[in-house]
Amino acid sequence: MNMTWRTALVASVAALGIGSQAAHAQQTVKATLRSDAIQLEPHDVKAGKVTFDVANSADNNMAHELVVLKTNLADGALPVRKGEVLEERLHKIGEVEDVASGRHKRVTLTLAPGRYAVICNKPGHYAAGMHATLVVSR
């Protein structure tokens, strides 16, 4: 009887450990950079480590980038000067620079709950529509 109780206790503790690991599992967001848009799949994730798999699928030979900004502003309402978002006025979490046409790059960031604007900040690209919103929940 004692052995059965211990076995159940060990199994319960092991299950709790597995559950907490699953809660902190790394997530991936596929970010597709087009000529005039950024498509995110999914648009919402849980807080923690998130890997952005960034692909430049633009129909031209332009390099793009992906900048992740924590902000309560709408992704289309960020402060801009001379065709670029003023990143220094916002909380930049990380970025992937210079993704050539037809190429992929990855970056892993730790994201807290909140709203994030995901943008390309090459001159003129944000104004052309290269922005999206990512929502991070607990």
Model-derived segments and their meaning:
Residues 19-25:
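Sec/Tat signal peptide C-region and signal peptidase I cleavage site
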Residues 73-111:
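Extracytoplasmic beta-sandwich strand-turn segments characteristic of Greek-key/jelly-roll folds
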Residues 97-138:
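Extracellular/periplasmic metallocenter environments
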